[in-house]
């Protein structure tokens, strides 16, 4: 009998504000994780239920009820699998950027993001209250720590997981693209793994949302600071990783993906951003102005 713990990182494209549609996608992938992969756990990205960034939608009167109804449905689907879902969570009139951990139709753990970014495209301190508690939960005999996005960019949250007994850390993210962002993510995670001697499973959102594009590129870094598996650029993917409980070692279920060059990355990100901007806004078509230059030729293709 295998002593592997099978964990899926769900790199998916969610739609801001479509809570019911995002819930449906989560449920479909929970079933896939159980039926096709025999997974013990599936982790979805930061604020997957509402899409990221929800901005002022978070203040709407009915948002709490819609979130709780969807979480109730996901709870019902959590028999025999642990489901980690990023969602806003409202408690005692405070709003948190949360990760809920569900198994066997119960919420077994909650984590509230500690480090709320408030620069550039981020305005999380306007919407959320920072969490203060560390979350380490038991998954089939393995102690798992949780962080959310910005938490891994600073000293503190990962080391607090280590000090609370975590054997590995799952980081759920909605980290938007810029030209050197993926290298920055890897460098940041490398420092956390190096300093805390914990492997980190990093799952990122994919898809365009207005001016932001999330490039995916989820990855797993083992305790020796090797990237053992990496998801694709700009594509939805369920990334499967196995943790050998006896050897305390991680293994990817497929090789590290093809590494596109810089121009290919930029092209794919622009393509995804434009496609999702059109589709998510329900546009039936568009008008393309062509001047005859190389920029117009690229737009036309």
At which residue positions do the language-model features occur?
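Enzyme catalytic cores with a strong preference for nitrogen-chemistry domains
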Residues: 1-301
């Amino acid at each position: 009998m295998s002593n592997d713990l099978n964990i899926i990182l769900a790199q998916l494209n969610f739609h801001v504000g479509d809570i019911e549609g995002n819930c449906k996608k989560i449920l479909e992938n929970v079933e896939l994780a159980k039926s096709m992969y025999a997974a013990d756990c599936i982790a979805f990205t930061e604020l997957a239920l509402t899409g990221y960034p929800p901005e002022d939608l978070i203040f709407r009167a009915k948002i709490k009820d819609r979130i709780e109804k969807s979480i109730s449905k996901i709870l019902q689907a959590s028999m025999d699998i642990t489901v980690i879902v990023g969602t806003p969570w409202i408690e005692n009139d405070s709003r948190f950027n949360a990760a809920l951990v569900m198994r066997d139709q119960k919420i077994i753990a909650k984590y509230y993001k500690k480090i709320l970014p408030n620069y550039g495209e981020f305005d999380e301190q306007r919407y959320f209250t920072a969490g203060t508690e560390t979350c380490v939960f038991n998954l089939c005999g393995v102690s798992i720590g949780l962080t959310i996005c910005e938490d891994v960019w600073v000293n503190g949250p990962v080391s607090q997981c280590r000090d609370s007994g975590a054997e590995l850390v799952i980081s759920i993210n909605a980290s938007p693209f810029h030209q050197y962002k993926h290298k920055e993510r890897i460098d940041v995670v490398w420092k956390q793994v190096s300093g805390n001697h914990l492997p980190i499973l990093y799952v990122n959102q994919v898809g365009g949302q207005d001016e932001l594009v999330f490039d995916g590129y989820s990855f797993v870094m083992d305790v020796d600071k090797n990237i053992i598996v990496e998801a694709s650029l700009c594509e939805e993917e369920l990334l499967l990783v196995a943790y050998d409980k006896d050897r305390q070692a991680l293994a990817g279920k497929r090789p590290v993906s093809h590494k596109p060059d810089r121009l290919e990355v930029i092209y794919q990100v622009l393509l995804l951003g434009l496609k999702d901007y059109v589709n998510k806004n329900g546009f039936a078509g568009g008008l393309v102005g062509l001047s005859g230059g190389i920029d117009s030729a690229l737009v036309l293709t």
